[in-house]
Amino acid sequence: MTDVQIPSPIVATRVAEADRLRFLPTYFGPSMLRMLRGEALVFGWMGRLCAAYHGGFWHFYTLSNGGFYMAPEHDGRLRIEVDGNGFAGELSADAAGIVATLFALNQLCAELAGTADADALIDRYHHLAAFASEHAEAAAIYRAID
């Protein structure tokens, strides 16, 4: 008999208020400049992707596979438009945050290309992409980042 192992779903956990200060250095690295750059890229990508976004509070999430993402606190859906691939659609704030975080990680990896720091961020990109493939809005997320 063959034992078939079914992979466990990747679980997202919202970071508690008391743990928020450790989030950015844990996932973007200990450099203050990189932490600020990473956070600013996520916010910036959301601003480029969503005309209705004008800042606000963000939730931080850790993933059981070692990844992470950030998502704006917002009730309802957000209109996301990606000029580079023609995607236009409405996503939950959670899915929109995943898209913005993936774009930000991609850009930060390109900026740090050829360094060990880039390798860690590339892994985090792939961890988040794996989670996105299990998300309820996976099809829309992947169309947005295509």
Swiss-Prot record:
This is Antirestriction protein KlcA. Keywords: Plasmid. Induction: Expression is decreased in the presence of KorA and KorC. The keyword NADP does not apply. InterPro entries: Antirestrict, Antirestriction_sf. Could be involved in overcoming restriction barriers during establishment after conjugative transfer. Disulfide bonds: none annotated. Pfam families: Antirestrict. It comes from Escherichia coli.
